[in-house]
């Protein structure tokens, strides 16, 4: 490692990363490392968790392709999973000049929100029962888009900015969270991922919350106080492992990451030109006949 120095505090085990001048650009939060034995489907594993100190003026970017609209991820809660329309990548870049790859392949919670709010489903629906054509595993079908309303209350101990996290349990068509009459999360389309997070400024005391989601979703809502800490947690893993990349520029950090992960090869020239994209081919005959039509048209 040419452009960084790694220091380990023996009493606490805390690891810090500095540049050649000795300036710290990243450090673990002392005592935050966790590796707890667990099982998944009867197989032994570990819950791995690590927190890092995050200065008040730090900006964090990355983690993949999400619909939540966040640019700066400092303090935001995200669940890193792969679903249709969402691509998770446990790599982030900091304006402090470093990149961090949380080297886990399974589900990972970024800045997990562990304070859950009791939600009560209301008897009435939101009154928008309708059928829409949706892509399913059996092809395009008309599926009910009926939505349900949930209500609840929660209390926060002090004024400040809080991370609000919604988990629907499955993909949905509506992510709508209102706190004290103010929309905090508001997304609607036919391809919403199961989770969404937002930051909200709240006063100390009790707050009323409403959640609107697809009727067959099972929503869970949680919160956490935003602080100057960044946390990764993986519930089913074999070890705690992460990699750090250092500048001096964003380009050099990404270049180091690409050197490690491997460069994507260019496609051959014959693969460029007309690209056919569709939902699916329903049978072998459907696919073969489509190719025949392409050849007839010299595509």
What are these regions (language model features)?
Residues 267-272, 299:
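Loop/turn elements at helix/coil->beta-strand transitions in domains of secreted/extracellular proteins
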Residues 274-284:
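Active-site mouth loops of central-metabolism enzymes
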